């Protein structure tokens, strides 16, 4: 029968709600292989590995290594500097990332001996100077180690550094672990000598020998070493 104006019709209805994850903005964090737990950059003479970690899967980037989760990118850098890279998520979002690599030092420190002598052999040493623009850790001469922790040092007290008469070995090491090693001789004692002639008369001798207590340089071309 037809319902009149006062009739109320009811009907059961079932409603279904469909939920979807809200859109997530791409976020990328940067970390470095030469930054310690305190957040401090440490010197290194090796390449620095930069790691980009995303909060969702990203696309591969030329020159970078993408891990199995597709959320971590890594790349080794051999020079300090500020770099830029564009990271793209799997769903097409883009994020420009700027990062700075620092703490790389692959150059060995310098050491210079100031003195008088012949080549690497000195009869007088007035000074020993060491230098590295990124900082020197220590200087070791023979068995004596001197802490530096500075970019430049000039020493005049060579005995305190460990220099002895004879053969010396000096090693200077910078903060990144690069080292320079040199060997030098130090002899401040003058040689003794005596003349030896073949007939005990120097004026009539055909051969004159000069015997010394240590090796010397030849006076001129007329002499020979035996």
Where are these regions (language model features)?
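Conserved "repeat-terminator" motif of extracellular CCP/Sushi domains
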Residues: 3-23, 86
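Low-complexity, disordered linker/stalk regions enriched in Pro/Thr/Ser/Gly
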Residues: 21-226
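General secondary-structure propensity
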Residues: 1-3, 97
């Amino acid at each position: 029968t037809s319902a009149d104006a006062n009739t109320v019709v009811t009907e059961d209805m079932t409603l279904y709600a469909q939920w979807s994850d809200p859109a997530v903005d791409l976020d990328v964090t940067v970390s470095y292989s030469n930054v310690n737990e305190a957040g401090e950059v440490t010197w290194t003479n090796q390449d620095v590995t930069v790691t980009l970690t995303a909060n969702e899967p990203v696309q591969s980037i030329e020159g970078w290594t993408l891990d199995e989760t597709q959320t971590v990118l890594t790349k080794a850098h051999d020079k300090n500097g500020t770099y830029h890279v564009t990271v793209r998520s799997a769903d097409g979002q883009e994020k420009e990332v700027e990062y700075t690599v620092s703490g790389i030092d692959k150059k060995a420190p310098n050491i210079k001996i100031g003195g008088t002598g012949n080549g690497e052999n000195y009869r007088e040493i007035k000074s020993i100077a060491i230098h590295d623009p990124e900082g020197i850790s220590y200087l070791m001469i023979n068995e004596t180690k001197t802490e530096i922790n500075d970019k430049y040092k000039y020493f005049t007290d060579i005995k305190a550094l460990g220099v002895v008469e004879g053969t010396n070995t000096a090693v200077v090491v910078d903060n990144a672990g690069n080292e320079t090693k040199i060997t030098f001789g130090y002899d401040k004692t003058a040689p003794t000598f005596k003349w030896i002639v073949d007939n005990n008369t120097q004026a009539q001798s055909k051969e004159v020998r000069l015997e010394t207590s240590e090796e010397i340089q030849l006076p001129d071309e007329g002499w020979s070493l035996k």
